[in-house]
Amino acid sequence: MLFPTEFDVIVVGGGHAGTEAALASARMGAKTLLLTHNIETLGQMSCNPSIGGIGKGHLVKEVDALGGAMAAATDESGIQFRILNSSKGPAVRATRAQADRILYKAAIRHRLENQPNLWLFQQAVDDLMVEGDRVVGAVTQIGIRFRARAVVLTAGTFLDGKIHVGLNNYTGGRAGDPAAVSLSARLKELKLPQGRLKTGTPPRIDGRSIDFSKLDEQPGDLDPIPVFSFLGRAEQHPQQLPCWVTHTNERTHDIIRGGLDRSPMYTGVIEGVGPRYCPSIEDKIHRFASKESHQIFLEPEGLTTNEFYPNGISTSLPFDVQLELVHSMRGLENAHILRPGYAIEYDYFDPRALKASLETKAINGLFFAGQINGTTGYEEAAAQGLLAGLNAGRYVQEKDAWCPRRDQAYLGVLVDDLVTRGVAEPYRMFTSRAEYRLSLREDNADMRLTEIGRELGLVDDARWDAFSRKRDAVSRETERLKSTWVTPKTLPPEEATALLGKAIDHEYSLAELLRRPGISYDGVCSLKGGECAPTEPLADDPVLLEQIKEQVEIGIKYQGYIERQASEIERNDANENTRLPDGIDYREVRGLSFEVSQKLNEFRPETIGQASRISGVTPAAISLLMVHLKRRGLGRRNGTAAEATEQGDGTVPTQQ
């Protein structure tokens, strides 16, 4: 049956990538259909009940700055909030929250059901409708055909998923949900390059059986309680709960070693590669054999359940081994396991077969986002989903794709890494992956992206008004500090000594004083009995006020470093965005080695910058390529791309 309504964009999958994709597409005005196998699992947290962390929190803030849902949903469902690396510089500080699974799903579903231009439909997708080299719709398991001009596929771990517990295995997309076997087979027919990856989850524990008196308590930050969204308020948070800490021990490790002969990972049953930075407990014991103990965090799953998530013991060992290893740890001697841990293998597709817009190179209008691209984590999925949904909407509107640059957003780093380098293991975001991380901080994600989001149609009036007030206040206050001066005559020596350690000997602007180590914005404003404070309040809202003060202080203190980084970006920008012709045959480029020309022909980079980051492509090869383009008159910063780069929005032409 052909469904009577035709849509602009169809999103397949209702996880973190799919929900952000559907919301982004609909916000742009595209008539969007979200197809999910089960409406009750929209926004499901399949593994850890947490959002954020180092690098990941930066992505969440960027999604929020572009009008996405993840940060706001976390503020409404978060039961513990912490700022990680709080004693370090602002570039690596990151927000992390424990979320109530039920509240998080409810917050996401509420947004989906109340988003204009968005329709929901519960049916698993078995097939894609493809005509020639373009996608035209999707087919459900009962044969309903939905037509659309673009499809965003966000299948998570469901593509030919196989669950392993010991040497037992069965098909499944996650525990309790069926795998997408037919869709996986159909995608194989499309000849898209693919592979297998693996991830896992720990057993869940009944909190009533935990002896908390033997555990170390880990409270969240309480003064103040952090928020994730730039529009968030601590009053939105539900009741706050602590986490708890225990440790593995030698007995635990002996139990695990004794079970490796029945581990699917160590008997060759699992072929997929697992995440390096979220390893199973079996991997930890094997890779860090000399380590006597590993920290395990017991994280509450929610306010209305006794279920706990033991972060650190992801495993696919047989259940009897899981039970024994849990009981070997302090405080868990009598723990009751509610759900066994398991590993899951699934299909992914080589992201080097994607454009930077996340559209597949082989099939026009087909976009991939999330774990299907070889990433791991809710945050990485949500960021890709927003970008894919945005660009699917722009595709059907015949507008240029938006592809954020590496110097513009962690989202740009994520996508560039995927489409140029590919993945050999599940990809996780870290701040260390960003070469311009001093400029790509959590605190300035809105300053970097909200204006772009507004131009793209992603940001509503409420967010834009709040951002505009903040941006203008930061600018005014920064200029005031630069133009307000104190002299030895106007600043009493005792007051200067109390703040600065000694009296001043010549004239200083307040900005120059603030630039000194250990001097805060509030400290500078307190000088001269408070006369150095602004005469008018920077903001009536206390949360907005703190954001403004933070931006002013960081901007002044790190001005020199940020300006140097901006100069470096400008130097690199000339070649970074030079577009490569679609039909170029790299075998014709004089001087290129066979290996380099083969890789360039295989991966078809879109820009010189992408080409330079392909493994094996040397700086010398890039120089030869630039000479070739100049001789042939082919190298160009495509009109739209060049203009967009100068405007800072990263738009590149859509090839349709």
From Swiss-Prot:
Compartments where found? Cytoplasm
Ordered alphabetically, the record's keywords are: Cytoplasm, FAD, Flavoprotein, NAD, tRNA processing
GO biological process per UniProt: tRNA methylation; tRNA wobble uridine modification
**Species of origin:** Burkholderia ambifaria (strain ATCC BAA-244 / DSM 16087 / CCUG 44356 / LMG 19182 / AMMD)
Membrane-spanning parts:
none
**Species lineage:** Bacteria, Pseudomonadati, Pseudomonadota, Betaproteobacteria, Burkholderiales
Q: How does it assemble?
A: Homodimer. Heterotetramer of two MnmE and two MnmG subunits.
Q: Name one GO cellular component term.
A: cytosol
The cross-references to Gene3D superfamilies, in alphabetical order and at most eight, read: FAD/NAD(P)-binding domain (3.50.50.60), GidA associated domain, C-terminal subdomain (1.10.150.570), tRNA uridine 5-carboxymethylaminomethyl modification enzyme MnmG/GidA (1.10.10.1800)
> Entry's SMART domains?
GIDA_assoc_3
Report the protein name in the record: tRNA uridine 5-carboxymethylaminomethyl modification enzyme MnmG
Q: Which NCBIfam families match?
A: mnmG_gidA
Q: Which cofactor does it need?
A: FAD
The free-text function statement in the UniProt record for this protein reads: NAD-binding protein involved in the addition of a carboxymethylaminomethyl (cmnm) group at the wobble position (U34) of certain tRNAs, forming tRNA-cmnm(5)s(2)U34.
Which residue ranges does the record annotate as region Disordered?
636-656
Q: Does the keyword Electron transport apply?
A: no
| Binding locations of NAD(+) | 274-288
Q: Which domain of life is it from?
A: Bacteria
Query: According to its UniProt record, which protein family does this protein belong to?
Result: Belongs to the MnmG family.
**Record: residues binding FAD:** 13-18
What the entry lists under InterPro entries is as follows: FAD/NAD-bd_sf, GIDA_C_N, MnmG, MnmG-rel, MnmG-rel_CS, MnmG_C, MnmG_C_subdom, MnmG_C_subdom_sf
